[in-house]
C-alpha cells in the first residue's frame, strides 16, 4: 500500500447546472463494452458471493444444464470477465478447473463520506484490496470542498500505487443522507448543508471520465459491505442498523438492497418513539435519533451527571475539556457506573422497540448492528435483543440472529466498491438468454 502525501486542491472544471435533470452517468458498461446475458450474470453473481466455482458447482446452484453452463463459461472467458484458475482434486482422481473473477478487468473505487470523515478504497475487479486511506473531514464543509478532496485523494492513491486512472471503471459513493437513487442526488439531508440535489455524479465524472459513478445512502452501502464480507455473508434477508451521529437501516431483501419507491426505505432514525419529545433536525419531535443516537446518549448522560448522578461521567467530561461523548458513557458503564448503564440500556430499548416492528413486518434472518455507537458493546446489544424478543412474534424471532458487524468501520468502503460493481454488471446485461 502506498503512502499518501498531502494533496493540493485541484480546481474544479466548472459546476454542472442544477437546473437540468441529472441522470446516472453511463461511461461504459464493462470495459470494451462486454455485454453479458442475464444467465451469464447469474454465474458472475454466484462467484462474487461464494468465491471460485467449478462447472459442477454452477450446475448445482442453478437450474441450467451442463451444456448451457459450458456455453456461459466460454462466453465469460472470451470476454475476460472470468478466468480459469487452479484445478481442484475430487474423489476418484478427477480434476476440475475453478473459475473466478478477472481482477485485471479494471479497478473499482469505494468512497464512504461520513459526517466527520472520508474513507476511500481501491480494489481490482476480483474484489482484492489494493489501497485504502481515511482522514477526518466534515460533510458540513459542502460538496465542492468535500468532493474536491475525495477526487484529489483518489488521483493520489492511483498515481502513488502505479494504477492507471483510465482503468478505474467504477466509483461507488456512500453519503450520510437520503438519496434519490434513480438520479444519484442527495435530497433534503438534515446534516449536509449545501448538498441538496447537488450533482455529485457529474462532479466526480469530470475528474474520472472513464468511470461509472453511482451514489447511495451510507447505510445501504454498509449493508452491502456486510453481506459481501461481513457477518451477513450469504444471508439473503437482513437488516443492517447503523448507530452513530444518526440512526438508519439498510434492508437486504433476497440478496439485494431494498430502497423503496423513492430511495428512502430504512430511515428508522426518524420514527417517533418519544412524544412529544425533543425537536429533531428533521423538524419532527421525539425521533429515535433524539434518544438513542450517539449525541443523544452523550447529552442525556451529561445532563444527569451535572445533576450529581455520576461523578465518573462528570470527571470524564471535565477531563476531556468539557466534552462528553457516547464512548465516554461506555467507559463509565464498564467501570460499573449505574447512570451510564441505565442510559445505554434505555437507548438499546428504544432501538429494539423500533426493530421489533421491522422484524414483525419483514421477518429477516439477521440484524447486524454497526456504526460508532456499537462500540458500547454487549450491554447495548443485549438491550436491543431483549426488546426485539419481547415485542416480536415468536415465529419471527425463532431463527433470528442479532449480532455486531464483523467489519466495523470498513463496511462503508467495502460496500461502496460492491455498489460500483453491482451497477456495472447491472447495466451490462444485453439480453435475457
Name every feature range the model reports, one short phrase each:
Residues 1-87, 91-93, 98-167, 275-276, ...:
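ATP-binding/phosphotransfer module of carbohydrate and carboxylate kinases, centering on a glycine-rich
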Residues 84-86, 212-217, 251:
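General beta-strand structural signal in soluble alpha/beta enzymes
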Residues 108-112, 168-172, 238-242, 248-250:
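Short glycine-aspartate micro-motif
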Residues 124, 181, 252:
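Short, acidic, Ser/Thr-enriched surface-loop or helix-capping motifs
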Residues 129, 186, 257-258:
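Hydrophobic "anchor" residues
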Residues 132-237, 379-391:
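Glycine-rich phosphate-binding loop and adjoining helix at the ATP-binding site
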Residues 218, 244, 416:
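Active-site glycine-centered loops adjacent to acidic/histidine catalytic or metal-binding residues
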Residues 231-292:
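Glycine-rich phosphate-binding loop of actin/hexokinase-like ATP-binding domains
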Amino acid at each position: 500500500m502506498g503512502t499518501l502525501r498531502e494533496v493540493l486542491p485541484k480546481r474544479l472544471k466548472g459546476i454542472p447546472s442544477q437546473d437540468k435533470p441529472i441522470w446516472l452517468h453511463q461511461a461504459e458498461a464493462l470495459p470494451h463494452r462486454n455485454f453479458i446475458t442475464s444467465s451469464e450474470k447469474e454465474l458472475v453473481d454466484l462467484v462474487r458471493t461464494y468465491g471460485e466455482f467449478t462447472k459442477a458447482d454452477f450446475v448445482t446452484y442453478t437450474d441450467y444444464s451442463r451444456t448451457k453452463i459450458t456455453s456461459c463459461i466460454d462466453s465469460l472467458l472470451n470476454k475476460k470477465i472470468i478466468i480459469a484458475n487452479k484445478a481442484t482434486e475430487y474423489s476418484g482422481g478427477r480434476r476440475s478447473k475453478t473459475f473466478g473473477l478477472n481482477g485485471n478487468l479494471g479497478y473499482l473505487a469505494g468512497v464512504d463520506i461520513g459526517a466527520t470523515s472520508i474513507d476511500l478504497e481501491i480494489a481490482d475487479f476480483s474484489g482484492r484490496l489494493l489501497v485504502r486511506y481515511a482522514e477526518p473531514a466534515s460533510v458540513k464543509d459542502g460538496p465542492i470542498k468535500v468532493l474536491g478532496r475525495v477526487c484529489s485523494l483518489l488521483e493520489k492513491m492511483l498515481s502513488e500505487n502505479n494504477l492507471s486512472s483510465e482503468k478505474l471503471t467504477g466509483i461507488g459513493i456512500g453519503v450520510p443522507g437520503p438519496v434519490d437513487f434513480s438520479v444519484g442526488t442527495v435530497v433534503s439531508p438534515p446534516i449536509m448543508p449545501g448538498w441538496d440535489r447537488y450533482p455529485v455524479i457529474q462532479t466526480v465524472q469530470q475528474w474520472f471520465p472513464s468511470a461509472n459513478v453511482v451514489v447511495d445512502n451510507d447505510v445501504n452501502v454498509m449493508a452491502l459491505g456486510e453481506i459481501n464480507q461481513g457477518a451477513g455473508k450469504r444471508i439473503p434477508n437482513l437488516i443492517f442498523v447503523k448507530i452513530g451521529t444518526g440512526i438508519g437501516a439498510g434492508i437486504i431483501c433476497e440478496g439485494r438492497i431494498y430502497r423503496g419507491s423513492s430511495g428512502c426505505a430504512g430511515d428508522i432514525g426518524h420514527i417517533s418513539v418519544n412524544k412529544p419529545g425533543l425537536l429533531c433536525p428533521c423538524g419532527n419531535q421525539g425521533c429515535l435519533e433524539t434518544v438513542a443516537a450517539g449525541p443523544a446518549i452523550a447529552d442525556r448522560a451529561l445532563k444527569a451527571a451535572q445533576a450529581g448522578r455520576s461523578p465518573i461521567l462528570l470527571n470524564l467530561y471535565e477531563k476531556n475539556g468539557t466534552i462528553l461523548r457516547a464512548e465516554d458513557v461506555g467507559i463509565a458503564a464498564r467501570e460499573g457506573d449505574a447512570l451510564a448503564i441505565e442510559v445505554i440500556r434505555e437507548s438499546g430499548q428504544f432501538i429494539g422497540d423500533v426493530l421489533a416492528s421491522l422484524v414483525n413486518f419483514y421477518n429477516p434472518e439477521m440484524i447486524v448492528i454497526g456504526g460508532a455507537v456499537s462500540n458500547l458493546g454487549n450491554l447495548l446489544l443485549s438491550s436491543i435483543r431483549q426488546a426485539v424478543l419481547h415485542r416480536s412474534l415468536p415465529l419471527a424471532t425463532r431463527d433470528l440472529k442479532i449480532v455486531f458487524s464483523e467489519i466495523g468501520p470498513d463496511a462503508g468502503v467495502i460496500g461502496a466498491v460492491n455498489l460500483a460493481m453491482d451497477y456495472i454488471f447491472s447495466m451490462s446485461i444485453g439480453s435475457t438468454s
